[in-house]
C-alpha cells in the first residue's frame, strides 16, 4: 500500500513538473581549438559551437571574441571574431570556425568569448563560452625541432647504411657471375 501510494505521488509530481516546463531559448556555447599546437606564423584554427537547448528560438545571436585575440598579436587569416546569427531554432546548433595566425611566441591566455542573444524581443541574455585557459605558442624553430618530420635524420641514416648494403649486393653479383655453370648444372 505504501509503495503504490508513493508511486502514485511520484507520477503526479512528475506530470505536473513536465507540464509546467516551458523554457525560453537557452544557449550553451563552447570554444575549442582544433589545431594541436599554436605556432608563431602558422595557422591556428578555433571552433565556436552554439547549442540552443531551450524550447523557443534564440533571436539576434552574436559571438564576440575580439578581446581574446588582439590584432597586434594575431593575424586573422579566415573568418570573423564578431559573428551575428539572426536566429537559432530550438533544439539546433551552429558552429563557426576562425583561422588566426599568432605573430609572437610565448604563453598566452585564451579567454572566453561573449555570446549575446534575445529570447524574445525584450529579454536580453549574455553568456560566455568555456575558457581553454593558458596555452603556449611555440617558436617556429622550436616546433620544427620537436614535431616536424626528421628528413635529415633519414638522409644521414641512408648515407651510413647504403655503402654496406650496396657493398654486399655487389659482392653477391660478382660471386654469381663467377659460377654461372654451377647454377645451370644444378637446375638440369
Swiss-Prot record:
Residues 173-188 are cytoplasmic. It holds the Pfam family TRAP_beta. It is a single-pass type I membrane protein. Keywords: Endoplasmic reticulum, Glycoprotein, Membrane, Signal, Transmembrane, Transmembrane helix. GO terms for cellular component: endoplasmic reticulum membrane. Heterotetramer of TRAP-alpha, TRAP-beta, TRAP-delta and TRAP-gamma. Belongs to the TRAP-beta family. This is Translocon-associated protein subunit beta. It comes from Caenorhabditis elegans. The gene is trap-2.
